[in-house]
């Protein structure tokens, strides 16, 4: 059975009462193999000691407090790893934005949509902002039509996140990357590139008459 320790100037990010630090008369114990049971704290501590693990109070405000039978060091390690993985994901995933106008022409639409598609394939969320200048705000329908075109174009790699929303003279449309769609998109793209790289077939002369010798 362990006591909470710190090394040097490091402090644990999460602190739990464990073992002898748990002073309440009874606790609800969650077992590693599943299931739970309310028992006297001293019995729960004894059980933890017999198993060579720790009694960890994870929900002190519950009635009675909830404790887990687990190795304290492993629990902290798992929580730190989960926190690091979350931070890593937050760093690699960012929001990319491109602006459109309700009368955006086809060339500009295709060019910008290709960039949005690239951002999504790299795992980024994207926001398409449709800006209404001057009196063009009276043509809100064009903005929603453009949002639908964007949704259709990006549907091979993403899903639209909610409905388009107006804020002032701007219409915001959000898209979330879809892992499965992206994998399928990449497979189809690789196949198309492979086919395009194949040498052309020789001409079929089977139907032409043979020359007389």
From Swiss-Prot:
- Record's InterPro entries? T_IF-3_C_sf, T_IF-3_N_sf, Translation_initiation_fac_3, Translation_initiation_fac_3_C, Translation_initiation_fac_3_N
Q: Does the keyword Protein biosynthesis apply?
A: yes
Gene3D superfamilies named in the record: Translation initiation factor 3 (IF-3), C-terminal domain, Translation initiation factor 3 (IF-3), N-terminal domain
Q: Which GO terms describe its biological process?
A: ribosome disassembly
Question: Domain of life of the organism in this record?
Answer: Bacteria
Q: Name one Pfam family in it.
A: IF3_N
Q: Name one GO molecular function term.
A: translation initiation factor activity
According to its UniProt entry, the function of this protein is described as: IF-3 binds to the 30S ribosomal subunit and shifts the equilibrium between 70S ribosomes and their 50S and 30S subunits in favor of the free subunits, thus enhancing the availability of 30S subunits on which protein synthesis initiation begins.
Family membership:
Belongs to the IF-3 family.
Assembly and interaction partners: Monomer.
> This chain belongs to which protein, by name?
Translation initiation factor IF-3
């Amino acid at each position: 059975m362990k006591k909470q320790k710190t090394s040097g100037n490091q402090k644990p990010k999460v602190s739990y009462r464990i073992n002898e630090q748990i002073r309440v008369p009874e606790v609800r114990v969650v077992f590693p193999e599943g299931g739970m049971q309310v028992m006297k704290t001293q019995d729960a501590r004894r059980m933890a000691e017999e198993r060579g693990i720790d009694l960890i109070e994870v929900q002190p405000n519950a009635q009675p407090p909830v404790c887990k039978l687990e190795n304290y060091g492993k629990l902290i390690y798992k929580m730190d790893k989960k926190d690091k993985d979350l931070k890593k994901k937050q760093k690699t995933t960012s929001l990319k934005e491109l602006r459109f106008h309700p009368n955006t022409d086809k060339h500009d639409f295709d060019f910008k949509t290709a960039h949005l598609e690239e951002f999504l394939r790299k795992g980024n969320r994207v926001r398409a902002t449709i800006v209404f200048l001057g009196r063009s705000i009276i043509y809100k329908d064009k903005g929603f039509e453009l949002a639908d075109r964007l949704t259709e174009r990006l549907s091979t790699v993403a899903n639209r996140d909610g409905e388009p929303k107006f804020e002032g003279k701007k219409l915001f449309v959000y898209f979330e990357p879809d892992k499965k769609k992206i994998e399928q998109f990449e497979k189809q793209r690789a196949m198309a590139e492979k086919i395009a790289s194949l040498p052309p077939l020789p001409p079929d002369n089977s139907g032409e008459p043979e020359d007389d010798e």
